[in-house]
Amino acid sequence: MPKIAQIFNNNVALVDLDNRGQAVVRGRGIAFQKRRGDVIPTKQIEKIFYLANETSRQNLYFLLKNIPIDVVTTTYEIIDVAQKQYRLKVLDYIYITLSDHIYEAYKRYQAGTYQETMVPDFHIQYPAEYAVAKQALQIIATNLGVQFPQSEIKNLALHFINASGEDDGEQVFGKSNEASLSQLVQEVLKRHHITRSHSNGNYYDRFMIHLQYLIDRLQRVDTYAVTIVPEVATELKQNYPQSYKIASEIFDEIKDQLYRSMSEDERLYFIIHIQRLINEAPAQNHSQNDSL
């Protein structure tokens, strides 16, 4: 039976499982008037999110420093849907970036400052990711009580496209490589007068997190390879020429100075990050950019 390790609120708790590590459980009133060590009857648990390894536990505690538990469990539920219903393989950092995105969007929505962003639309090339994102809107509405516009599907889908891959367990970063890569990228950004600011801070930080996991993927021999659809490359280059230019500079310098074997797919991921950083409007519209 699950035993309480930590109570987050009346409805959410961290539990110890007999021989299966830990999990976050959610259910109406499951932790009400309970204490650490108390047993939670399994019939009261509505959702369970397993923490498979130390990285999963570290991600959870990192998130809880700044993000409400209801947003965190909503994110876990969305990723659970992606993995179980749609068989999507994603890297662990999506727990951080997606939680952060949902929370920031939630705060802006509540404050009346939410604005739709101009991001690429790839629902034809990535139907599963967009299906997850569409379902995510329903989960967010149910759990958090906010109804984002349909255009938010593009933002949510990009998180799954960007985090495509498969973790083999623990994340081990080479600190010297991480510092070199981060410095190189920041120097290119500064040449184009792009620095971290209040308005772009969230997108800037997500890009830096992507770079950390990029290093880890490049150091693995058995990296899970994801090939970007060719039409996406053409679409990005035509629609976002400035983002393409900056992203290509970053890609070329990393490849020349640090990692010659880097996949061409990374150039496209960089474009997506840069486009959000500078909020570049599309140079031309295509039928696939119509609302879903």
UniProtKB/Swiss-Prot annotation:
GO BP terms, alphabetized: positive regulation of DNA-templated transcription
Top-level taxon of the source organism: Bacteria
Keywords in alphabetical order: Activator, Repeat, RNA-binding, Transcription, Transcription regulation
Pfam families, per database record: CAT_RBD, PRD
PROSITE patterns (UniProt xref): PRD_1, PRD_2
PRD domain mapped to chain residues: 66-170, 172-284
GO molecular function: RNA binding
Keyword RNA-binding: yes
Database matches in NCBIfam families: trans_antitermLacT (NF041678)
Role of this protein: Mediates positive regulation of the lac operon by functioning as an antiterminator factor of transcription.
Recorded family membership: Belongs to the transcriptional antiterminator BglG family.
PANTHER family in alphabetical order: CRYPTIC BETA-GLUCOSIDE BGL OPERON ANTITERMINATOR
The protein, known as: Transcription antiterminator LacT
Biological source species: Lacticaseibacillus casei
Source species taxonomy: Bacteria, Bacillati, Bacillota, Bacilli, Lactobacillales
